[in-house]
């Protein structure tokens, strides 16, 4: 069984794969202040609930866009799982040809998504990941990672509206009953949701025009389903794209180590 961990700025998503299939997954808040023991006990509770144990896990891979948390997570893996985790970063074999000016600037989550997207859906491809920041990644027909777009996530937009406008409340991100709001909350929900849908459609349209291709558009992340239901540019929603990519990278690198006799 392989344990995969994707650490984002707001939430961390954990999963266990068995024989190539995602057996279970969990979501927890990203907390930069937790120790390796606190993380260890939290993960133990999650595993216990599914009838699993640390001993069932034979390998671990971690992707993180929050560097301060990595020390505690790596220590947790070594102390409780007795396994040194594979970390997505310099040295890991991704198989990607990254055309960024500085490839090291590409976030680990974007690399993982690209690996999974290419293997599962082919190329050319645009991957939209709705996280704390929303990222758009373009992979061309030769499977080269060409770059992308980064925008504030939908929750950041909603929080900015709440924090900077004294009389506006904090709202739940959900579809309102009509585009024209009949009260402050529904008007804000309409503005946030449909404003964001318009942004997604506009950016994807411009990316396609610049690429002079019609790449398939894959959406992932917490709000991917909600946005896709209102948009006409998203072809596939894959909520576990990142976890699948982590598993693929683990298998790829574990096989390479076996070939080298490590």
Swiss-Prot record:
GO cellular component, one term: cytoplasm
Catalytic activity, reaction form: (R)-pantothenate + ATP = (R)-4'-phosphopantothenate + ADP + H(+)
Principal subcellular localisation of the protein: cytoplasm
Known cofactor(s): NH4(+); K(+)
Pathway the protein takes part in: Cofactor biosynthesis; coenzyme A biosynthesis; CoA from (R)-pantothenate: step 1/5
InterPro entries found in the cross-reference section: ATPase_NBD, Type_III_PanK
Residues involved in K(+) binding: 129
Binding site for ATP: 6-13, 132
One Pfam family of this chain: Pan_kinase
Active site location: 109 (proton acceptor)
One Gene Ontology MF term: ATP binding
Domain of life: Bacteria
Subunit structure: Homodimer.
Name recorded for this polypeptide: Type III pantothenate kinase
Annotated source species: Bacillus cereus (strain G9842)
Phylogenetic classification of the source organism: Bacteria, Bacillati, Bacillota, Bacilli, Bacillales
Gene name in the database record: coaX
């Amino acid at each position: 069984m392989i344990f995969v961990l994707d650490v984002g700025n707001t939430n961390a998503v954990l999963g266990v794969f068995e024989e190539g299939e995602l057996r279970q997954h969990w979501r927890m808040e990203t907390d930069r202040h937790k120790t390796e023991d606190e993380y260890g006990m939290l993960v133990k509770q999650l595993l216990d609930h599914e009838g699993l144990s640390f001993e069932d896990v034979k390998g671990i891979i971690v992707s993180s866009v929050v560097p301060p948390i990595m020390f505690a997570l790596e220590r947790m893996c070594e102390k409780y799982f007795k396994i040194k985790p594979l970390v997505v970063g310099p040295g890991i074999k991704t198989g990607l040809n990254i055309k960024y000016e500085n490839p090291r600037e590409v976030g680990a989550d974007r690399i993982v998504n690209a690996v999974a997207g290419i293997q599962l859906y082919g190329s050319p491809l645009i991957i939209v990941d709705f996280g704390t920041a929303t990222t758009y990644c373009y992979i061309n027909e030769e499977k080269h990672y060409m770059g992308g777009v980064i925008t504030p996530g939908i929750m950041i937009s909603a929080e900015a509206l709440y924090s900077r406008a004294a009389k506006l409340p904090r709202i739940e991100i959900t579809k309102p009953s009509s585009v024209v709001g009949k009260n402050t909350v529904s008007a804000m929900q309409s503005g946030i949701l449909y404003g964001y849908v318009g942004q997604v459609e506009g950016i994807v349209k411009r990316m396609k025009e610049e690429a002079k291709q019609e790449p398939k558009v894959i959406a992932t992340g917490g709000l991917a389903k909600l946005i896709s239901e209102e948009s006409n540019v998203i072809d596939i929603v894959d909520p576990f794209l990142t976890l699948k990519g982590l598993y693929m990278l683990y298998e790829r690198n574990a096989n390479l180590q076996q070939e080298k006799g490590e």
